[in-house]
């Protein structure tokens, strides 16, 4: 049974050394998997933050890594990447991996068992981290701004305010130094007790209130 990829991005690592455990061809091109990586992959179930980019190298040879992805392999050997993964995390019989996509076929030196150096694009990682932090702060500011529009308790966010974010957020796309979130004001939100009519009527005022709270 293969082992899951050991990840170190949570500790802020940008570099590492590891052994290539498999090289696969998929709908995303050539995917290199290593035993341990500092690369942060895009989450295929909630793809808010893009995966890290960077390089794999060995003895003067270098290949570029496109956006790192989630991958998985079954006990029977089925390999899948990103949205093609047919199961949820935690399902027995599957091992979870980080895939490093490269352009074209793998060069002759990039084979199973090879030792490689991994390097993440640091400025891009930092920009995405700032964008992710700003996204969370903005959502908390929005929850504060919309707190009086709830007629029922929707549950609380991390600051104890009514959690509009959790109820209405449909998608979040983080980019360097920012993010774009989309919200749905549908029947389910109204049934949950949110006053969508007042929200629409006072959108301009709420916008400036949210900006003020965010800046504060």
Predicted regions and their residues:
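Active-/binding-site microenvironments in catalytic and ligand-binding cores
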Residues: 1-216
